Amino acid sequence: MDETSPLVSPERAQPPEYTFPSVSGAHFPQVPGGAVRVAAAGSGPSPPCSPGHDRERQPLLDRARGAAAQGQTHTVAAQAQALAAQAAVAVHAVQTHRERNDFPEDPEFEVVVRQAEIAIECSIYPERIYQGSSGSYFVKDSQGRIIAVFKPKNEEPYGNLNPKWTKWLQKLCCPCCFGRDCLVLNQGYLSEAGASLVDQKLELNIVPRTKVVYLASETFNYSAIDRVKSRGKRLALEKVPKVGQRFNRIGLPPKVGSFQLFVEGYKDADYWLRRFEAEPLPENTNRQLLLQFERLVVLDYIIRNTDRGNDNWLIKYDYPMDNPNCRDTDWVMVREPVIKVAAIDNGLAFPLKHPDSWRAYPFYWAWLPQAKVPFSQEIKDLILPKISDPNFVKDLEEDLYELFKKDPGFDRGQFHKQIAVMRGQILNLTQALKDNKSPLHLVQMPPVIVETARSHQRSSSESYTQSFQSRKPFFSWW
């Protein structure tokens, strides 16, 4: 964000929901000798420093007391000025976030974002996650508990401020293999939010709620220029408030990125899948896992996730604990285990074409035994009525358009290509569900692209053209 940012300066507006200590509300120490008694007219000598008063006749002790009182008054004024500057910075920071982080359609999510903003103002900063190839952060609340995962746009694997040196080394030493030519670079945060949108529209409920959020924190990876400018502006606001109040932005610039709610009690799917292979699940519990797995398949296939391994989707297995207090009772509550799946790391989805160069980016869940089981009737009843309705698909496209156009580098032509791939995926999925196929058979279907047909005549209904992609990647298994 540049210096011409439309953000409001701290003196123009204040948020109604946050209050900060103001100068008038501060309690300052009483200064001895600070009060001056004004004598009545014509009674007694004039007070010191009044017109007509001879300073040479004033006792030296009174002069010293007056000087000390004046010095203490200046000290209190300086402290008040510093408090005012700090309050202005805090007000401006919250005002900056509030202008962009409003989610009236999801008040619960907005509460979590507010908790993150308050924690940052209390110097409880997000903590960088050292796994992965991008800059991602655990966001905490004022109690220090992890509440979300934030992934800034400019710290993505191909962002200019990615703190991980591996991608920088790959870009420097092997530029021909840098990036994925089937993806729109530096739109991972939109892909994360888009996957959450598709999940909610289809009522899959496996993606933790994710939205586009603006946050600023000392622990984020900023350029040296941004940090120097931030320190200079804060210093100017503290020392010369009249000058500092002219800045459009105080502090570090907010970063735009994906804000995904943190889920507790989950582990990598690879851990539980190995465990279930050694210790087979009961029939009812295994069916729960299969139903959750099918939802993951539907989501990944529609958004064409190019980065789905068994280490970036999660499983939560709540099994009944052996309670020793219940052994001697006549009544024992028998509770079946509960299995849930969470689909995270959706930042490399929504390609503008099917992979056709070096790598195929396959779905690694296709090699699991669950992928060989035909789709259940439950997933058919949940998904088929939606994706078979052209109006539903059109609404989904419009919602994705409203989300993706927020990016400064948004390109309408690229977006139409992304939607064409998604339409083809939906077409294949619809046919697979109707034909009672399995997830393994689904991924073996030829990739399809469904584009909007261009017509010189205006029509109330759109027509589409379907095409198959014949070119295959060099490595079909990688």
Swiss-Prot record:
A GO BP annotation: endosome organization
Family matches, as InterPro entries: Lsb6/PI4K2, PI3/4_kinase_cat_dom
A GO CC term assigned to this protein in UniProt: glutamatergic synapse
Gene Ontology molecular function: 1-phosphatidylinositol 4-kinase activity; AP-3 adaptor complex binding; ATP binding; protein-containing complex binding
Top enzyme category: transferase
Residues found modified as Phosphoserine: S5, S9, S43, S46, S50, S461
Region Important for interaction with membranes, residue ranges: 164-177, 267-275, 358-367
Residues with lipidation of kind S-palmitoyl cysteine: C173, C174, C176, C177
Lineage top rank: taxon: Eukaryota
Subcellular location: Golgi apparatus, trans-Golgi network membrane; Membrane raft; Endosome; Endosome membrane
Main location: Golgi
Region feature Disordered, mapped onto this chain: 1-57
Tissue spec: Detected in adult brain, especially in neurons in the cerebellum, brain cortex, dorsal root ganglion and spinal cord (at protein level).
Topology of this chain in the membrane: Lipid-anchor
Residue numbers binding ATP: Y130, Q131, G132, S133, S134, G135, S136, K151, Q260, L261, F262, V263, D345
Residues passing through the membrane, by range: none
Pfam family membership, one: PI3_PI4_kinase
Stretches the record annotates as Catalytic loop: 304-312
Residue segments, region Important for substrate binding: 156-158
Known catalytic reactions: a 1,2-diacyl-sn-glycero-3-phospho-(1D-myo-inositol) + ATP = a 1,2-diacyl-sn-glycero-3-phospho-(1D-myo-inositol 4-phosphate) + ADP + H(+)
Family, similarity comment: Belongs to the PI3/PI4-kinase family. Type II PI4K subfamily.
Function according to Swiss-Prot or TrEMBL: Membrane-bound phosphatidylinositol-4 kinase (PI4-kinase) that catalyzes the phosphorylation of phosphatidylinositol (PI) to phosphatidylinositol 4-phosphate (PI4P), a lipid that plays important roles in endocytosis, Golgi function, protein sorting and membrane trafficking and is required for prolonged survival of neurons. Besides, phosphorylation of phosphatidylinositol (PI) to phosphatidylinositol 4-phosphate (PI4P) is the first committed step in the generation of phosphatidylinositol 4,5-bisphosphate (PIP2), a precursor of the second messenger inositol 1,4,5-trisphosphate (InsP3).
Subunit: Associates with the BLOC-1 and the AP-3 complexes; the BLOC-1 complex is required for optimal binding of PI4K2A to the AP-3 complex. Interacts with BLOC1S5 and DTNBP1. Interacts with FOS; this interaction may enhance phosphatidylinositol phosphorylation activity. Interacts with ITCH. Interacts with ATG9A.
Protein name (Swiss-Prot/TrEMBL): Phosphatidylinositol 4-kinase type 2-alpha
Lineage: Eukaryota, Metazoa, Chordata, Craniata, Vertebrata
